[in-house]
Amino acid sequence: MNKNHWAVIPVSQSVLKKVYIAFVLLCMVISGHAQSQYNNVLVLQGRIKDFVTHVDVPGSKVEVLNASDSAVIASTEALNEYQSGEDKWVTAEYWMGIPRKEGNYILRVSYDGYATAYVDLPLLHLYKRETRRDLGTIFLKRPKTLNLEEVVVKTTKVKFYHKGDTIVYNADAFQLGEGSMLDALVRQLPGAELGKDGRIYVNGKFVESLLLNGKDFFRGDNKVMLDNLPTYMVHQVKVYDRLGENSRFLGQEVAGDKRFVMDVQLKKQYNIGWVGNVEAGGGTKDRYLARLFAMRFTDHSQLAIYGNMNNLNDGRKPGEGDNWTPSDLVGGLTNQQLAGIDYNIDARSGKYQLSGNAQIKHADNTIIDNTNRTNFLPNGNTFDRIVANNRNHNVAFSTDHRLYFEFKNANLDIKPYFNYQYFNNKSGFSLLTLSSSLDAFSKSQVDSLYTPMIGRELLRSAISRNLRNGLLNGHSLKSGLSVESVIKFKHSPDHLTLYADASFRHETEHNYDHNRIDYYAHGQLNNTDFRNRYFNNRPDHGYSVTGKIAYTYVIRRELSIDFSYKYNHTTTDRYSSLYRLDQLTDWGTNTTHELGTLPSVAAYSHLIDAANSYNSWQADNTHTFGAFLVWNKKGKKSEWWAQVVPNLSLLSRTMHYRNGHVDTTFTKRTVLYNMPSTLIRWKSTDRKYEYMFQYHVDGQAPDMNKFVNVRNTTDPLNITMGNTHLLPSYKHELISHFIRTYPKKGLMWIVEAQYIPTVNAIAMGYTYDKATGQRTFRPENVDGNWRGRLFLGGAGVLNKRRTLDFKAMFGTNYERSVDLIGLSGVVSADRSVVNSFTWMSQLQLNYKIGQSSIGLKGNGNWGHVSGNRNDFNAFNVADFNYGFIAQVRLPWDLRLGTDLTMYSRRGYKDKTMNSDDVVWNARLSRPFFKGKLIVMVDGFDILGQLSNVTRTMNAQGITETYSNVIPRYLVLHATYRFNIMPH
């Protein structure tokens, strides 16, 4: 087989079409037999509440009696759990099946401490498709006040256990340092992974929402709660599949209305009144921090106020066991301030909910990146040395709200939002391209890149040098509103969903730069190109409107299908004008005008670079037809869940594009197939076994700008072109996992496999001019890109006393990256294929000794990289670390948290990056006033060896970047806790 045309595509487009045809036939068969599934059973549903408080009375006994002889026909318990975690549906809702026979009946409801209620129940004139009848709410009256004793269940401090479908983590079982926030706890949870962006995974599954006491606080911003909620307030962390408001409203699970959530449960004493903490401190190197976090809880409302300001970059605490590496640091030096408010109000009647938040954030970031890049080219590579110095200033305000109303036969969900951002960024950039590897030069020789005349040694292999200073400022805003309503039908289990949203965005951007390119030939400076430029990117605005209707047809209780139609219209209007100020006298190479200043409009308006200025207008119309087939089956020993979710989208997109050389209007019509969440899952009822297989298809149409056949020379070293023949790309994801849990032993393990190929991937292939270092990019469709993963992970305790526990993961990654790279003057570009194989391992052991703990940790990634070119030299690379962590209780009520880790790198092209860095952090703390005040001293990178190096690789080359990091420091800070209970 010719390796230049090799591709592994498990699902072709013809096969995908066959799948859709088979699915349609299946739906027809199901619909044809649907009526036979309506057996002679009528489901009665309702809810039981206290007459005075309107609070549910779960556990009430509900019976249906024959009105003629009072014989009991059916009975049930009004206790609903929805199969989604044991505590989120502790309600008195009930469902009960009776023979489908018209007549007069009596409903009897009883519960200890309440008077028995009797309700007449005439069941007359049953409709043909009426399979259930809603009896509404029945209120029970108390004959007298009863004092009920609270039941307290004491359990041993196991780290986690399963209760139904819910994983329950006991927060008190983890050894955490004084002053630790929620992020420290989440990092230690068995099976959990916490990314630096706040994204959480449990057993490889993405956590869609982070909840607080079952409420969706800080929606979409996990880091607010992770960075500000103290762990001393946390009782348990629960992970489960949560059903949404629509499922609760309808009394049945709605397709697509389930989210995988992590629910943080507070200790009982913090569930009412005001609770919070205040923290402040300062240290060496002008480090500082200040924090306020306060919450108020009542039985029907929650309010949170928070503020945070610091210049510490990293929220990690010494002695916390995790898989943190220096690359997780926020790049550079960051000074940020953040403040916000979050609220939630639930009506006691359950008829409405109000919630929302507002946040303002300011950040200054200074980052210096030193990058070495190897460019894979036919007949010999080239090598880049890049230094980027950026100072970014941003202010952002965001607010979103939710108004939810519930009526007898419909609900209404309204969500408005508004976001605004201002930015002012300064940048410095230096790029030197060589025909020889940087390994051949000393550091002092390479540093001459920044001088007016580069060193003689570099001149011999220099191709080009780019020096650029830039200033970018502007603002953006986006606002929108969505409305959704679910409508119930009185005599049918079916329901109708209506959805609409509208959004508007507006952006303004001013970009200034002084850009100089020196071209070299035969060891001499051959030519210099200097440009003083002003980009006026405004207006840039657009709007979008969406409407959707979906009808859910309930075939039987365990089988339903949802048919939907969605229409979206999006309009975008962009203007970008480029002015060449260097053509004015005194604005050229030796200009003294400060970057960001402009001459009069009359002076520069005629200097427009027409070839690289443009205005574009685009209108998209998308029609999406979807279906959602759900089947679930409960048995005595196992549960099955399966769903198929095919979508067919018809896109009609029109663009008008005009610049100095092109004035064109064109339309692209595309048919896209998508399958967002198709899966089959099996679980044992004892929760010891779980298997799941998922298949997703994500079809993406090419960006319309890529169809415009223009030659953009805005960046003389990176020229872009269009391609009118691009095809849609399809990413297929096949994911399978098996989980084994040992509840009594506190052990679990998981094995997961992933295979993710991309059909018709859009690659920005390029041809390279070795004489000037100029790249000319053109988008092309390529096949053969895919990646796969196989790993085994486990966590749990290792001894009977539960003092020794572990977390471990071992696996492999394989990635095949395909691109197109050619040389200037060659007719066609060659396929560049790079194969990357990585072996991963993580292991952490923790041993608990009374109120102290000590742990060992090790993480490693070992990779082998090969390519299809004859001149490609395969190489190996490794990143690994190992060390220990400890939380120690000392005399005089002192507590020490510390971690010592060796970070090692091997196989980097830049030999200075192949290093062994010992990083030591420590925290000494002491509580005062019964724990209300905690004083802490932190030492960060005490040995001063921390460095931040990242490496990326694809078919175009290898990039290694060293970023500046915060210098070592000591900081003294104190935290005061408060808890104000209502009288």
Feature roles, as predicted:
Residues 199-245, 261-266:
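Periplasmic plug
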